[in-house]
């Protein structure tokens, strides 16, 4: 059985009709700026097997980040179904119970770390256990230390984010994601804000997770990152155009399509 199946995911961003420039004049005459639509996902289908590290690769604007956000209900899809470890979720009509069920099985790793600046590495990892799960602090600290050991930062448990390098901060965010032991890790450009050496270290850590039973879905625009995954799924214009061997030439994004610098996609 596949760990994760995605069926017919669709998403269109809409801008509401708004008064045009010089609204005071045009609004009285009835002239308004027309609403616009941008179809970002066009019926995406894919399957991820348990324990795989899969890269979803594509240039800026291809829809890859929006797809990942829909899978974790950070965006609501217009249509689509997610089957995760045998459980089915309607990506267009989820209630709070559905979202809670899904998030018990997934963890999201962001490009920007999103650490609490006034808390230590250990406190960042254990915050959710103590507040959301009401776990006693002593027990939460023990679990948190195990996660920091797993990412090679046990000796930095008392450090604040400002005392950590970018790569170390990303490792803390991964430890925080792992603390609930989710079967699926969703990572959005986790190496995008790092230099190439540190990025390879973080990617190596994500690759190690599949040996511990985790399934990793990694979003990237970078061919050199994607090629290290077990498999590449390439998106262009909101559609899957390649799904297969990560070392095949046709899996790669053409250099002319790559952004000059890594950019965080707002609607892609």
Language-model features: locations:
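ABC family nucleotide-binding domain
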Residues: 2-235
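Conserved beta-strand-loop-alpha-helix hinge in the C-terminal portion
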Residues: 239-266
């Amino acid at each position: 059985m596949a760990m994760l199946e995605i069926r017919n995911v669709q998403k269109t961003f809409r801008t509401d009709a708004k008064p045009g420039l010089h609204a005071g004049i045009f609004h009285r005459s009835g002239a308004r700026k027309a609403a616009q639509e941008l179809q970002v996902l066009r019926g995406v289908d894919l399957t991820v097997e348990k324990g795989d590290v899969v890269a979803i690769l594509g240039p800026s604007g291809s829809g890859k980040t929006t797809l990942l956000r829909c899978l974790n209900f950070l965006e609501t899809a217009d249509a689509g179904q997610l089957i995760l470890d045998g459980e089915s979720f309607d990506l267009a009509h989820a209630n709070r119970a559905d979202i809670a069920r899904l998030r018990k099985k997934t963890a999201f790793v962001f490009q920007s770390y999103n650490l609490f600046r006034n808390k230590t590495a250990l406190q960042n990892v254990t915050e959710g256990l103590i507040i959301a799960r009401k776990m006693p602090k002593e027990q939460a600290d023990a679990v948190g230390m195990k996660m920091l050991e797993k990412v090679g930062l046990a000796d930095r448990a008392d450090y604040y984010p400002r005392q950590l390098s970018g790569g170390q901060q990303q490792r803390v965010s991964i430890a925080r994601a792992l603390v609930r032991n989710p079967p699926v890790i969703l990572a959005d450009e986790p190496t995008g804000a790092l230099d190439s050496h540190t990025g390879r270290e973080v990617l190596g850590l994500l690759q190690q997770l599949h040996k511990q039973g985790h399934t990793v879905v990694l979003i990237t625009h970078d061919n050199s990152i994607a090629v290290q995954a077990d498999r590449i799924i390439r998106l262009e214009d909101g559609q899957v155009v390649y799904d297969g061997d990560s070392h095949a030439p046709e899996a790669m994004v053409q250099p002319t399509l790559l952004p000059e610098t890594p950019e965080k996609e707002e609607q892609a």
